[in-house]
Amino acid sequence: MKQYNDLFKIIHREGYIFIASFALVSFLLASFNEKLGCIGFIATIWCIYFFRNPDRFVPISDDLVISPADGIIQEIKEASPPPELGLGDLEMIRVSIFLNIFNIHVNRIPANGKILALHYNPGKFFNASLDKASLYNERQSVLMETDQGQKIVFVQIAGLIARRIVCDLEEDNEVKMGERYGIIRFGSRVDVYLPLKTALLVSKGQTAIGGETIIADFGRKKTEEFKFERK
């Protein structure tokens, strides 16, 4: 029984219906045409691959902010967070992480703290790599306060292909860095907004690993040896 539980654990629950549907269609196609069945089988394998949900080795520190998603650091710039969160024209550092269809799309909490506000904003589906996607695309915005008293924002943004954002958070949730909190289907972007004086530890073009890559440090000794735990 444990082996079956472990198997389901490594696949995000949002993928179950897709995988089952692909498998059923593949079986039906194979009964009519072997080549079509093979194509369906390959599509089913890809679907399993897309919804993979592996454990990560998460750093243990209240001063760190980690990447909430796998992908490429596409842009780092000063920008105001989504207006629906009520922060006004406050300028923050925005780190944008672009996910292609081959990246893991499970999203993780970037820091230890408490969820202050959430807001879902329906919108368009421009290519997530475009700068205007942050403003116009469908998005789920989250405002949290870290255990060190810093306010940060992270935003799930739908892309050209992605048509569903899943966020399992609620206001007043106490959250831990690296915990899974949602997923975006299929190809997307995640923005992280940090206070202007935050020391960044990533650069544009860098590959980020959700739950592991440290993107910022709120001020502990830079020589500190960080510990990690599996989640």
UniProtKB/Swiss-Prot annotation:
Report if keyword Lipid biosynthesis is assigned. yes
**Location of the active site:** S188
| Protein's pathway | Phospholipid metabolism; phosphatidylethanolamine biosynthesis; phosphatidylethanolamine from CDP-diacylglycerol: step 2/2
The record gives the membrane topology as: Peripheral membrane protein
Recorded GO molecular functions are: phosphatidylserine decarboxylase activity
Q: Name one GO biological process term.
A: phosphatidylethanolamine biosynthetic process
Protein's UniProt name: Phosphatidylserine decarboxylase proenzyme
> What organism is recorded for this protein?
Rickettsia prowazekii (strain Madrid E)
